[in-house]
């Protein structure tokens, strides 16, 4: 099984659209979409990873 990851190279973004495509982070928090998740990854200095797609 390949590790699940998301390309966050084009983040952080100053504003995220309100699209609902939830992702579950390694902090067991559900992020609304890739944009909000990637902004959190940047804020965590790369310590936050993707647990899985969908709600936690």
Curated annotation (Swiss-Prot):
SUPFAM superfamilies, per the entry: Kazal-type serine protease inhibitors (SSF100895)
Any one GO molecular function term: serine-type endopeptidase inhibitor activity
The entry's keywords: Disulfide bond, Glycoprotein, Protease inhibitor, Repeat, Secreted, Serine protease inhibitor
Disulfide bridge positions per record: 8-38, 16-35, 24-56
InterPro entries with a match to the protein in the record: Bifunctional_prot_inhibitor, Kazal_dom, Kazal_dom_sf
Signal peptide: none
Gene Ontology cellular-component annotations: extracellular region
SMART domains referenced in this protein's UniProt entry, alphabetically: KAZAL
Entry-listed glycosylation sites: 45
Chief subcellular location: secreted
Pfam families: Kazal_1 (PF00050)
Site label Reactive bond 3, positions: 18-19
Locations listed in the record: Secreted
CDD domains documented for this protein: KAZAL_FS (cd00104)
Matching Gene3D superfamilies: 3.30.60.30
Ranges of residues in domain Kazal-like: 6-56
UniProt note: domains: Avian ovomucoid consists of three homologous, tandem Kazal family inhibitory domains.
Protein name: Ovomucoid
Organism: Pipile pipile (Trinidad piping guan)
């Amino acid at each position: 099984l390949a590790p699940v990851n998301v390309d966050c190279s084009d983040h952080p973004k100053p504003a995220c659209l309100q699209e609902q495509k939830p992702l579950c982070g390694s902090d067991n928090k559900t992020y609304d979409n890739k944009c909000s998740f990637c902004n959190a990854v940047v804020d965590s200095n790369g310590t936050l990873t993707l647990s899985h797609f969908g709600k936690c």
